[in-house]
Swiss-Prot record:
The lineage of its organism: Bacteria, Pseudomonadati, Bacteroidota, Cytophagia, Cytophagales. One of its GO terms (biological process) is riboflavin biosynthetic process. GO terms for molecular function: 6,7-dimethyl-8-ribityllumazine synthase activity. Catalyzes the formation of 6,7-dimethyl-8-ribityllumazine by condensation of 5-amino-6-(D-ribitylamino)uracil with 3,4-dihydroxy-2-butanone 4-phosphate. This is the penultimate step in the biosynthesis of riboflavin. Its EC number is 2.5.1.78. It catalyses: (2S)-2-hydroxy-3-oxobutyl phosphate + 5-amino-6-(D-ribitylamino)uracil = 6,7-dimethyl-8-(1-D-ribityl)lumazine + phosphate + 2 H2O + H(+). This is 6,7-dimethyl-8-ribityllumazine synthase. The keyword Transferase applies. It comes from the Bacteria. Pathway: Cofactor biosynthesis; riboflavin biosynthesis; riboflavin from 2-hydroxy-3-oxobutyl phosphate and 5-amino-6-(D-ribitylamino)uracil: step 1/2. HAMAP family: Lumazine_synth. Keywords: Riboflavin biosynthesis, Transferase. 5-amino-6-(D-ribitylamino)uracil binds at residues 30, 64-66, 88-90, 121.
Length: 159
């Protein structure tokens, strides 16, 4: 089922106490009107699950392409247990969209494997701004929420 048919921000299941864990969130500044609500959604979920605000570290990068390096910097920090990458790439008239989406998805995967830590892909890849807004707190939920839930669930597997 595609996310166009379902709001995926609701979930079920227990998440154990992870209040001692530290979460890094790297946020792309490009398309800030989209990425900021993604960030707010992710933080709200982490706080709701008992993660202290002091255990949430934010790093901004200029664009989605830079998320991989920002994630690596956070993953290298002593004490960071998981990293959430938040960005938005909107299809334009050129192939730039394809190159950025491909590079960032591979880059984030490589950081996951290199540091053996959850590095979560919270990047919207949409055809237009309306689709992006729909997934940044709109009718299809907030993918920032979902990225935080994924980080929590992945860390829960380590205890």
């Amino acid at each position: 089922m595609s996310s166009a048919d379902k709001n995926l921000s609701s979930y079920s299941g227990e998440i154990p106490n992870l209040s001692s864990r530290v979460f890094g969130i790297v946020v792309a500044e490009w398309n800030e009107e989209i990425t900021e609500p993604l960030y707010e959604g992710a933080v709200e979920v982490l706080l709701k699950h008992g993660i202290p605000k002091a255990n949430i570290i934010r790093t901004n990068v200029p664009g989605t392409f830079e998320l991989s390096l920002g994630a690596q910097w956070l993953a290298m920090k002593k004490g960071v247990d998981a990293v959430i990458c938040l960005g938005c790439v909107i299809q334009g008239e050129t192939r730039h969209f394809d190159f950025i989406c491909n590079a960032v998805s591979i880059g984030i995967t490589e950081v996951n494997l290199k540091f053996n830590k959850p590095v979560i892909f919270g990047v919207l890849t949409t055809d237009n701004k309306e689709q992006a807004f729909d997934r940044a707190g709109g009718k299809h939920g907030n993918k920032g929420d979902e990225a935080a839930i994924t980080a929590l669930k992945m860390l829960a597997q380590t205890i």
